Amino acid sequence: LVVAFAIAALFLPGGTASNAAADGPIVIRYASLAPSSSAFGKILKAWGRTFKQETEGRAELRFYAGGSQGDERDFIRKIRAGQIDAAGITTTGMGMIVRPILVLTAPGLITEMDQLEHVRTELRARFEEMFHDVGFELLTWGDGGKNRLFSANPFARPADLKAGRPWAWKDDPVFASYLGVIGANPVRVGANEVYGGLQTRMIDTVPCSGIMAVAMQWYTKLNYMAKQNFNIIIGGSIVKKEIFDRLTPGDQKILLDTAERSARAMDKIVIRDDTKAYKTLIERGMTEVNLTPYQAEWDAVAKKSREELAGRVYSKSLLDQVTKLAAGK
């Protein structure tokens, strides 16, 4: 999932060590899990240069890349404490700020990018208002690829995961619920602990995208990969509204516009590289698992999980609305 965070992070504003001097530029301190040397990191730097240039030096982004500020949980905590101002986050981080947004990752509901785009376009204003209500500005959306199951052990049906040690992010209620319906016991640790867990066999199954599996090197400890994905890793860039409001209206627009342009450039890379990573993993010997023979069982688990999350993570009415939109209604 780190890749996902990284990806999302690349799309938004950065940060600084000190907020803004009265006679100097407003500096936005931005944390990202994306390594500075990665394609994501390079787009992030380009975005920072463009923002500074278009604001004529009135504001700038200062990036803390490669997880130097911790995990997504740390990002949110530090933003609230005033230690940083912005971050690139994925599913987990977004859900820590606005819980209902996790409806976009409800198991089996949205599995294709065009579905996700349609749903978000229809509900964007509603979600942005949710972020405003808790003191954040959602600068732009960004995604981390198709989320599928990877395992060190053979699997074909949901019950096969019961004997395993599947990982669920400690702040992710969605996949934990999914595993709970199956009857599997998740190992709940942060994303930065997954590789070590795979090495020691404390973890043997992970949900992630192909691009993440490669970028995090998790694939080196895994042997099987589901052909079908069960959702899409969402993400985006957020900034504390207090900092955003210090910008002039013109510079606010520049921040939003440049963030959006960077996000769209990143989307192209994610879609291309996630597909490429999936094919590369198969070429390197990863066994592709076609879930179709037991699709009815997987669908039943996903449906029950979505229903159990309703009322606890998102409302039943929001789930119904997203379900209709995802179906093109």
How should each PLM-predicted stretch be described?
Residues 4, 19-115, 123, 129-329:
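N-terminal secretory/targeting leader peptides
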Residues 2-14:
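Bacterial N-terminal signal peptides
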